[in-house]
Amino acid sequence: CYFTMSDLGLNYWVAIAAAAVVVAALSVICERLVFHPLRHAPPIHDKIAAIGILLFLEAVVQMYWGADFRRIASPYNQILDIGGLTLPAQRLLIIVGAFSLMGALHLYLKKTMTGATIVAMAQNREGAFLVGIDANRVAMMTFAIAGALAAVAAGLFAPINLVYPAMGHLVLLKAFVIIILGGMGSIPGAIIGGLIIGFSEALGGFYLSSTYKDVIAFVLLVVILSIKPTGLFTKGVR
């Protein structure tokens, strides 16, 4: 997104769309070259491979653009006053975009045949294959959707933060916390887990100190796992 806006001079929304296409294609390539050969390996191998890809891509980005902090100019710099609540337009765009994408993904998985095949394969890959589902095609589609959504999320998030190669580390850690809190295999749980983390960080930063804002997610993780180790909305997926 930074490259397409700063170097190519594309419009903000065009840059996000281009980033979504590129990251989706890159995700499919990673699935074919890395994760597909590991489909029968122990689950830990996938995690190690994902970390390796992350470090490799960060190194490539740093080689071309350096490790300096950069900014993406937001086309929405207005400050909105909604019922006495002051809110930057870009942050409102992030909120609306997040709920819109979550709703679209939920409808896609629940109301379309393709979405149903993705859910079926997530629950039982071998069983899905036995009933005629093309597991390879569904896997590539799943990676493409995940990559595109990640690119759109990053494009919405980048204008309110500094952009640098390792900017995703903290986001990934919080995503891990959200998945654990919500329960593996539960999309509604992931949504509610994200809201819990978001509100907790906002309230903690306001009443305590913004210095400790990023620690709150991990404190919540320890507390909730101590009470309910399977997460709040687990679907029984192991």
Segments from the language model and where they lie:
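Hydrophobic core segments of alpha-helical transmembrane domains in multi-pass membrane transport
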Residues: 1-2, 20-26, 53-61, 97-106, ...
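Membrane-interface helix caps of multi-pass small-molecule transporters
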Residues: 3, 7, 28, 32-37, ...
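Alpha-helical transmembrane segments within multi-pass membrane transporters and channels
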Residues: 9-53, 60, 192-197, 228
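Transmembrane alpha-helical segments in multi-pass inner-membrane proteins
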Residues: 9-21, 143-150, 154-219
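Residues that define the loop-to-transmembrane-helix transition and helix capping
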Residues: 13-14, 45, 126, 136-137, ...
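Short amphipathic alpha-helical coupling elements at transmembrane boundaries
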Residues: 35-40, 77-81, 117-130
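Transmembrane helix-bundle core of multi-pass membrane transporters
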Residues: 37-111, 138, 203, 208, ...
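Helix-loop-helix "hairpin" substructures at the membrane interface of multi-pass membrane proteins
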Residues: 86-164, 187-193
